Amino acid sequence: PDLLKPIEPWDTQSIIFTSGTTGPSKGVLSSYLHIFTNAGPETWHFVTGEDRFLINMPIFHIGGMGVIFVMLCRGGSIAVMDGFDTEKFWPFVRESRTSAFFLLGVMTTFLLKQEPSQHDKDHSVRLAFMVPLTETCTEFYERFGIDVYTIFNMTEISSPIVSEPNPTKRGTCGKKRDGVDVRLVDENDCEVALGEIGEMIVRTDRPWGMNSG
């Protein structure tokens, strides 16, 4: 049936709640174009429609819901796990034929603490996101044969910083992707010198490419 009202790119697609890092969790209004900018091919170009992405984080948060949007944009598939469980993780990954997943840094530590096995590379996974990137990146890549990426993102923005595979610089978030401007500024919005601490400000070259409020 016809829609009662046409859907426009700037219409609100979802309200996703933040982690509450700096205070109470806040609902973020995301337009259709914000979601596409965050999840579309220009951000994570190495994820394709042939992938099956594991969801092992809450879907009320961008860490879980964002993966759904990423695969919707590509026509790919997802595998849904009840929650992260160190003992059940690899059996589920193998059974579901997962090819990509997202790990918080501490999850990586838990997986590496498991006893090494001859089956460590017996899976179909080709890439993983590690956020934040920890010093275990190289160990994880070598042990499990999985390319590791990292990003800097927030519910309100659209993945402005993305790494190359298997970064070696400890603490890196990656580099500015195409389609965004990123600056580090002081309290007067003046750009700080190289090596100095500043506030990161971001804008996209696409209208409605970030949150609506």
Could you say what each language-model-derived stretch is?
Residues 2-17, 24, 46-52:
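Conserved pre-ATP/AMP-binding loop-to-beta segment of ANL
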Residues 5-7, 171-176, 191:
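Short Gly/Pro-enriched turn/cap motifs at secondary-structure boundaries
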Residues 31-32:
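Short coil-to-helix segment of the ABC ATPase nucleotide-binding domain corresponding to the Q-loop/switch region
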Residues 36-52, 59-99, 110, 114:
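Conserved AMP-binding/adenylation subdomain of ANL enzymes
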Residues 73, 90, 95-103, 112-170, ...:
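Gly/Ser/Thr-rich phosphate-binding loop
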Residues 190-213:
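Conserved ATP/PPi-binding loop(s) of AMP-dependent carboxylate-activating enzymes
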